[in-house]
């Protein structure tokens, strides 16, 4: 439930952010995603929520490096699958003055082998 609340908070923040940046009454947003199951799911959920709010949503599938470059050049608006503090740390350091982290769905994300207790 805690993860769901965090995701909901991030999505509400995204809608607020997108509302501030829309011009000429045209509500558009571009969502980027990589081919990872959780990223695809979160991005499609965000797409559905934005469409319910009247946004025209563009979905952009790419690898991580081009996504960060696109975000930094304002060619894309949102990437929901940044793994911090470790996995995407170098990208965040490279583009930190051009990107804004507005929320988190999972704190201290790590990649590795997992063995249940």
Set out the residue ranges of the language-model regions.
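Bacterial signal peptide processing site
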Residues: 21-23
